[in-house]
């Protein structure tokens, strides 16, 4: 982890009845695989979420980004059987302050766990978003999926398991940014789903590779 920074700040998804933070202890290496843990608990104001996030020290620009991820589930080891649980986001993305650059591949933990969200932002302007449905019999929480996006001037192409699943030619960032993996909680009837207190969830990451343009 020498080339990465572990986050210890407020997580996304806060509202009047939900607050989340990233904890250093929720980022571990287990048998050579990165594990980001998420827990949720009931507190006086509603729900408290404790997740994990890690970011590269180096900023990356145009090129090919590749990584293998098993989306949030109850699988306590990277090869165990696990189920998705409402109230979580599996995030894989590059990000620069105030979304000057943001290119996301995300998986929700609620009933829409079959979908992959592909989103690009520039300075928090209205995003360019595409939702892709996972192929039947291959769900992102059941095992590792190989994700890739190719970022070139004016275009981003998104791949899952070698198959092109989305192309963006609008709202395409230009500035280099760190790359991040995160696992954070939600408590919403929409994005990510309502919280599930007292159930530990795990996101697993096998590798990350960047090839410059």
Task: Give the ranges of each region predicted by the language model.
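Ligand-recognition surfaces built from glycine- and aromatic
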Residues: 64, 174-213
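Extracellular/lumenal carbohydrate-interaction signature centered on repeated Trp-anchored short motifs
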Residues: 54-65, 135-142, 199
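Short tryptophan-centered beta-strand motifs in secreted/extracellular beta-sheet-rich domains
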Residues: 65-67, 143-151, 156-158
């Amino acid at each position: 982890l020498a080339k990465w920074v572990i986050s210890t700040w407020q997580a996304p998804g806060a509202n009047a009845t939900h607050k989340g933070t990233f904890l250093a202890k929720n980022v571990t290496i287990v048998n050579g695989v990165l594990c980001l843990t998420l827990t949720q608990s009931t507190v006086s104001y509603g729900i408290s979420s404790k997740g994990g996030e890690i970011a590269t020290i180096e900023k990356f620009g145009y090129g090919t980004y590749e990584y293998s991820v098993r989306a949030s589930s109850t699988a306590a080891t990277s090869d165990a059987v696990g189920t998705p649980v409402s109230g979580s986001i599996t995030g894989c993305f590059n990000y620069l302050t105030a979304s000057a650059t943001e290119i996301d591949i995300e998986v929700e933990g609620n009933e829409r766990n079959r979908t992959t969200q592909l989103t690009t932002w520039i300075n928090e302007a209205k995003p360019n978003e595409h939702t892709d449905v996972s192929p039947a019999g291959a769900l992102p929480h059941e095992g590792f999926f190989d994700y890739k996006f190719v970022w070139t001037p004016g275009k981003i192409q998104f791949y899952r398991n070698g198959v092109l699943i989305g192309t963006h030619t609008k709202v395409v960032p230009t500035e280099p940014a760190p790359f991040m993996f995160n696992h954070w909680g939600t408590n919403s009837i929409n994005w990510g789903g309502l919280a599930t207190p007292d159930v530990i969830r795990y996101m697993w990451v096998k590798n990350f590779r960047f090839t410059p343009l």
